[in-house]
UniProtKB/Swiss-Prot annotation:
EC number: 4.2.1.9
Entry binding sites for [2Fe-2S] cluster: C50, C123, C195
Gene: ilvD
Residues given in the record as Mg(2+) binding sites: D82, D124, K125, E447
Pathway: Amino-acid biosynthesis; L-isoleucine biosynthesis; L-isoleucine from 2-oxobutanoate: step 3/4; Amino-acid biosynthesis; L-valine biosynthesis; L-valine from pyruvate: step 3/4
Keywords from the named record: 2Fe-2S, Amino-acid biosynthesis, Branched-chain amino acid biosynthesis, Iron, Iron-sulfur, Lyase, Magnesium, Metal-binding
Reactions accelerated catalytically: (2R)-2,3-dihydroxy-3-methylbutanoate = 3-methyl-2-oxobutanoate + H2O; (2R,3R)-2,3-dihydroxy-3-methylpentanoate = (S)-3-methyl-2-oxopentanoate + H2O
Keyword Iron on entry: yes
Protein name: Dihydroxy-acid dehydratase
PANTHER family: DIHYDROXY-ACID DEHYDRATASE DAD, DIHYDROXY-ACID DEHYDRATASE, MITOCHONDRIAL
Names of required cofactors: [2Fe-2S] cluster; Mg(2+)
Species this protein is from: Janthinobacterium sp. (strain Marseille) (Minibacterium massiliensis)
UniProt family annotation: Belongs to the IlvD/Edd family.
Amino acid sequence: MAFNRRSKNITQGISRSPNRSMYYAMGYEKEDFDKPMVGVANGHSTITPCNSGLQKLADIAIKTIKDSGGNPQVFGTPTISDGMSMGTEGMKYSLISREVIADCIETAVNGQWMDGVLVIGGCDKNMPGGMIAMLRTNVPSIYVYGGTIKPGNWKGKDLTIVSAFEAVGEFTAGRMSQEDFDGIERNACPSAGSCGGMYTANTMSSSFEALGLALPYSSTMANPDDEKVGSAAESARVLIEAIKNDLKPRDIVTRKAIENAVAVIMATGGSTNAVLHFLAIAHAAEVEWTIDDFERMRKKVPVICDLKPSGKYVATDLHKAGGIPQVMKVLLDAGLLHGDCMTITGQTVAEALAHIPSVPRADQHVIHPIKDALYEQGHLAILKGNLSPEGCVAKITGLKNPVITGPARVFDDEYSAMDAIMANKIVAGDVLVMRYLGPKGGPGMPEMLAPTSALVGQGLGESVGLITDGRFSGGTWGMVVGHVSPEAFVGGLIGLVEEGDSVTIDAHKLLIQLNVPEEEIARRRANWKQPAPRYTRGVLSKFAALASSASKGAVTG
């Protein structure tokens, strides 16, 4: 049986002789035209440590595809460093890069009639961008995560990149010495790999393992370790088998599979960005999934992993404790996973977990049994109210002050808010309102890690509320609410909040409310005018014109 189901369209027949001439120029032989053409979407880049260790994974995948009877076709995908662009205009390109990556992969795979694709990525938006493309093209596919960074260390304390962001606030508040500030800066990132807590990259990689389109254990391996190369090779072998069996992403990514992925996100205390990205992934898979489904899942899935940013441990600790397979086995035995879902290996979830012990090892403290869950319900809550009738996202577990009502401190951009924080003009009890930062208004929903980390560093992380129509980094924690929809730019109520207004965030009631009389709101709405777009050309302008509401995943098509 021939497995070049798609590529035969450009390699077979008399009329394709010129095509074969071009392949011969790249070292192909006649017998290669009967083999499947397998894309390798290589996200290697020296822009960021998240992607700087990917080439070795691409190299072994290329070799393994060839040794397994395929023709590897390598092409590059771009990346943005969320950490480096944070707090600058560059952060506006972060979410947009999700769409750009998806478009790049879709264009190469479909333009060249590839029979399958192996996607390699590292930084945050590489994951959803690659997955969206895999689902759009619906050719046999597998995701290879570049791996997590190892924890840094300073004076015996483990560090992540968030340690460096929080140090900015501590240092400027006079709560940290120059020696410690410099020491954290120099030692926070000791290797290649993505940011080490259960931040966005590790959240998405873990969810892909649960979804069934990445290999078991692959999502928590560290990039520098040899097992990461071995996993990339095995991924290539598994992909060739999937091509032979015509096992495609949409055969795997069903509504039940997405429930499995979201269950793991809740159980591990994952990033708020997962809400946005899984809305987009479901859209690409043509699976019915809404923002309210996250709240449904939150109510039944406990948090069983003690992971940063709000917990103690990092992804490498999770790996040593048994990784995502151990988390999934605990959830499966509790009736919180669908064991009959298919995975890219050809096994069901239940079959893949059959050899995993039901109870986590006693010599680790990262993964808890259900009876000893850290929190009885999940952490990613969907809040609604007059400020966000479509829904917005907050992490609500572990909050010392789950309810706050305070005066609004209103900022129409991130920079003025950051200036106010650094000048010590924000005090306990305030509610920061950062707006015109949504999909269309930002544009691109920039992340607010710099201001939230500065507040934490100043000791205000538990006593100040923050709401925005932008996003938060996976490293953010505290009384913060993002993805407020509808956004200010399209007339959402967040755009009508005035300095000093009373605003309530209530994690118990899942409420976000502007405490202003309806008559006053109506008066303000009558006087509101949509501002001019911040960009009128280029990719930012394109995204602003096409992006849907954050409550729909900020998808562009």
